[in-house]
Amino acid sequence: MKAEYTDVRQHIIDQGKAIITRKGFAGVGLNEILSAADVPKGSFYHYFKSKELFGEAMLEDYVTGYLAEMDVVLGQPGQNAAQSLMAYWASWTSESLDGSGCDCRCLVVKLSSEVADMSEPMRVALLDGTHRIIARLALAIARGRVDDSLPAVADPPQMAATLYQLWLGAAMLTKLRRDASALQMARQATLAMLQLPSGQ
């Protein structure tokens, strides 16, 4: 029985994103996306003029959803900024690994090196997404300086960019190692950089 959905464009994005998260962009053909979404080719091209433009829309959708999730984690009531930031980094460990220890979620990790030389629109979409993520982190760090949960360690945007790059690299190593050791090391480095106790 065909599943019911009202937004065909979003349905195609959701189905394609699920496959591409597992297989990468180049490893997924248009027919596989059409089959998963159970839509004809004409419907796809009504919304996306090419697979590349679909990829751009998919990444923009991913970033929008990711930022919404990020806002929830960083805005938990009853937590100071330091606690919220460490909860955010903890989510990387819990969500970056599936049962076999393989990255299964982050499209930034999955696609950055693949699409950077393949598609300028997709590269720009990912780059814009990382800028927006770093901006969210910078706001959280600045809030920590106001609520006294973080010391005045560095310029918030610079610290946010450094931490994000640290964790992104750790997530990429996690794919190679198939364990959480790189993420655990990133956590310890984050605590040191933010001058937080190890039990934070």
Q: At which residue positions do the language-model features occur?
A:
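Short, basic, alpha-helical segments at the C-terminal edge of helix-turn-helix-like DNA-binding modules
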Residues: 60-67
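Short alpha-helical elements of helix-turn-helix
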Residues: 10, 14, 106-109
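C-terminal peripheral helix-coil segments that are non-catalytic and often amphipathic
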Residues: 2, 87-98, 131-147, 157, ...
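Helix-turn-helix
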Residues: 11, 15-53, 57-58
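Amphipathic alpha-helical segments used for helix-helix packing
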Residues: 84, 99-121
